[in-house]
Amino acid sequence: MRRKNNNKIWIWVATLILSISALYGQKINQIAQIVGIRDNSLVGYGLVIGLNGTGDKSGSKFTMQSIANMLESVNVKLSANDIKSKNVAAVMVTASLPPFARQGDKLDILVSSIGDAKSINGGTLVMTPLTGVDGNIYALAQGNITFGESGSTLSGTIIGGASVEREIAYNLYNQENATLSLKSSDLQNAIKIQQALNDVFRDAIAVAVDARTIKLKKPENLSMVEFLALVEEVEIDYSRKERIVIDEKSGTIVAGVGITIDPVVVTHGDITIKISDEMPDDPEAIKLEDGTMMSRAQGTISSTNGTKPTVSSVVKALQRMGATPRNVISILESMKKSGALNADIEVM
């Protein structure tokens, strides 16, 4: 009988969520996470074998000792001083253990050289235990390493290269309370989540306690799993902070199309760039996009349609001036500090 009532409540709340979602824009699970349910970092020390003379040199004593220890585990006894191999490299292996991962699940891993190897390309990672901060082994890693397009052959990945051996227990079912944590602190968004949840469930089940934290109390007729599943689907009118994400290795820059830069002059090394609302006095000025003009001779970027130059236009201009990804990062950070750029910058 109770299960029937629960089903009715579930359908009623889900219907209410759909009707309210039309008024809002961002799901809670996209901007907040449930405290305690998170990824856990794993790390391990291992050896990559099968290298064509590009491994660690004999001067890397920890590598030679590790080889000796590995051989001893299969009843081959040698002193570390007797090993002269260049086909092996010592590496650190890292992975992320997602919540609710089960034994046998596969994890992607990152393998990075820590010795003086020239390259670990073509190598195979020997079985490596991956431990958590508590010292327990949660996964075993092994496999052939693949590399991206960055050009580096000292750090690579193995897709599905680790197998989960130990699970992290999450006791949700019998819980009565939970906590949401916003990914970015914002008082307005915390209050919006509180109001949206209380509207959906028609009860005071959510209380914002600060700019990041919302306390939740489960309704009596729902399990915690059912409750959190519904909470994650509720949408709010999210107040978004503009953000620029930069991958320094690849040079990739991701920014919202509407992020603009106010007039400013920045000098970084040999590069001087001026953001202006006046047309450059240069017949060889280049048109970039959205009416933005760039004068290479004057180091000026300006807009011809009355709007401010966008981050995209400025980045393209800097690249034409020969700026490296590191130069671009430094210049954008200087613009942010001066107040000309109103956006958070995240460097990966």
From Swiss-Prot:
Subunit structure: The basal body constitutes a major portion of the flagellar organelle and consists of four rings (L,P,S, and M) mounted on a central rod.
Name of one Pfam family that matches: FlgI
Record-level Gene Ontology MF annotations: structural molecule activity
Functional note: Assembles around the rod to form the L-ring and probably protects the motor/basal body from shearing forces during rotation.
HAMAP family assigned: FlgI (MF_00416)
GO BP annotations, alphabetical order: bacterial-type flagellum-dependent cell motility
Family: Belongs to the FlgI family.
Stored InterPro entries: Flag_FlgI (IPR001782)
Transmembrane segments: none
GO terms for cellular component: bacterial-type flagellum basal body, distal rod, P ring; outer membrane-bounded periplasmic space
Secretion signal span: 1-24
Signal as UniProt keyword: yes
UniProt KW Metal-binding keyword: no
Lineage: Bacteria, Pseudomonadati, Campylobacterota, Epsilonproteobacteria, Campylobacterales
The name this protein goes by in its record: Flagellar P-ring protein
Compartment(s): Periplasm; Bacterial flagellum basal body
UniProt superkingdom: Bacteria
Keywords of this entry: Bacterial flagellum, Periplasm, Signal
